[in-house]
């Protein structure tokens, strides 16, 4: 909400002090670009912190390995493995 109010305030200032429509358009464009770059910087900081968390050593590695198994590809072989193990 603060960003919207700041944007509207800057737009109002631009309209009251601008010499022409082109000046207003250019000033608004610059403000929008600046806000977008600031948001992207914030998001990249969040993503970098998430990457650090993902690279940390985690417990339950075996559990995560089981989750990654493609069960649809493995499921047809389960009865064969059970029969083979049961024969011994």
UniProtKB/Swiss-Prot annotation:
Location, primary (coarse class): secreted
Keywords, alphabetical: Amidation, Antibiotic, Antimicrobial, Immunity, Innate immunity, Membrane, Secreted, Signal, Target cell membrane, Target membrane
Record PTM Valine amide, positions in chain: 85
GO CC annotation, single: extracellular region
Span of the signal peptide: 1-18
Keyword Membrane: yes
Protein location: Secreted; Target cell membrane
Tissue specificity of this protein: Expressed in entodermal epithelium along the body column.
Domain of life of the source: Eukaryota
Role description: Antimicrobial peptide with a broad-spectrum antimicrobial activity. Keeps its antibacterial activity under a wide range of salt concentrations that mimic physiological conditions of human blood, which is surprising, since Hydra is an obligate freshwater animal with nearly no salt tolerance. Does not affect red blood cells.
Family: Belongs to the arminin family.
UniProt name for this protein: Arminin 1b
Organism: Hydra vulgaris
Top-level taxonomy: Eukaryota, Metazoa, Cnidaria, Hydrozoa, Hydroidolina
């Amino acid at each position: 909400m603060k960003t919207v109010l700041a944007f509207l305030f800057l737009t109002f200032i631009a309209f009251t002090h601008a010499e022409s429509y082109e000046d207003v358009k250019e000033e608004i464009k610059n403000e929008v670009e600046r806000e977008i770059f600031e948001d992207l910087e914030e998001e990249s900081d969040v993503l970098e912190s998430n990457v650090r968390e993902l690279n940390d050593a985690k417990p339950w590695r075996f559990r995560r390995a089981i989750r990654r198994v493609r069960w649809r590809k493995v499921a047809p072989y389960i009865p064969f493995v059970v029969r083979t193990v049961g024969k011994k």
